[in-house]
A protein has these predicted regions:
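Helix-to-loop junction immediately C-terminal to a conserved catalytic motif
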Residues: 56
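Conserved ABC transporter NBD signature motif
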Residues: 64-72
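Conserved ABC ATPase "signature" region
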Residues: 72, 123-141
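Short helical segment in ABC ATPase nucleotide-binding domains corresponding to the A-loop/adjacent helical element
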Residues: 96, 102-115, 126, 130, ...
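The feature captures the beta-strand-to-loop junction immediately N-terminal to the Walker
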Residues: 41-42
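A short, flexible loop at the N-terminus of ABC-type nucleotide-binding domains that lies
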Residues: 2-5, 14-27, 34, 77-80, ...
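ABC ATPase NBD coupling module
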Residues: 19, 73-89, 115, 122
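Conserved Walker
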Residues: 45, 49-50
Length: 147
């Protein structure tokens, strides 16, 4: 059985507006295994940032459940949530400044693997980069190109 670090169940975040109710996040569910990373990608205004903020309770969810490291954090107090956030991270990226134009696609993908000492062997890092590129649909011919 996989070791789940984050489980999000039926997360919703609605906002009242002059025109009615805006369903910014509507019934989002997913799990993340320990040691894995999740990227939420979508067009502007689709609810990516709101989803992240609701998970961290920087915005209170309208409904749903968030379980972090086996603990339901949905009903934690503000003080407990502040402490819990030290173990959680969300990175909001500006697509125009998120890629270093001096690094190849391969170097960019390998950087967190190397920095976090996930793998040390050069061949293993190269294999993981290749695997990750395949996972997200990046052609291998792009491995040594620049953004």
């Amino acid at each position: 059985m996989a070791d789940t670090i984050l489980e999000v169940k039926n997360l919703k975040k609605y906002f009242k507006t002059a025109r009615g109710t805006l369903h910014a996040v509507d019934d989002v569910s997913f799990t993340i295994e320990r040691g894995k990373t999740l990227g939420i990608v979508g067009e502007s205004g689709c609810g990516k940032s709101t989803t992240g903020r609701a998970i961290l309770r920087l915005l209170e969810p309208t409904s749903g459940k968030v379980v972090f490291d086996g603990k339901d954090i949905t009903s934690l107090s503000a003080a407990e949530m502040r402490k819990m956030r030290s173990d959680m991270q969300i990175i909001f990226q500006d697509p125009f400044s998120s890629l270093d134009p001096r690094k190849t696609v391969s170097q960019t993908i390998a950087e967190p693997i190397i920095e976090n000492k996930i793998l040390k062997d050069k061949k293993a890092i190269e294999a993981r980069v290749k695997e990750l590129m395949e996972t997200v649909g990046l052609a291998q011919r792009l491995v040594n190109t620049y953004p």
